[in-house]
């Protein structure tokens, strides 16, 4: 695979937004882009600040699972948000980002869908993980950090995950410019986020989301920390 330059400048050049990703921080290696964003928040980083790393030494996913991928072939990034809505609405931003990633990947010509609630999948295998974390101060949101990991040009998936995960390269045989994909994700996210804050629900994105839902009318298992349960994915509604 040819190596496409990947740094602050090459990423910034692909981001055509008003605020999402307009400030980019890039590191060859970091503990976690989410933790980095939290540190940037304490330094008064602005809404929409984007932290991108080539490698994470302490990346994590949902339910506290460790998340590590080889450097050079994936996207590892986190965006810092400073919303003024109530904390109870913040968790829905995970779905907003999931939709945004799926829309961006679709724009590359890939047949992509969303496995409820927010797994972005190609050929029914996961290509993306999203972790949303919130910091509070005096009962109000200080920051929301959304971490995104996308398997872009990975040529191999570790053996124990081959039936569950894949990459854009493995599914299409094509290599993709990570700078371009980050720019597409930021553009989609900015538009979707601005829809979300109008109503603090997903009502303005329901049709877009349900159209991309992979497991509609299929059984799903919800891995709640306290009480896992099963059900049928019918799509999303306003709540």
Residue ranges and their predicted role:
Residues 1-2, 19, 95-112, 122-239:
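Long, positively charged amphipathic alpha-helical accessory segments at protein N-termini or as interdomain linkers
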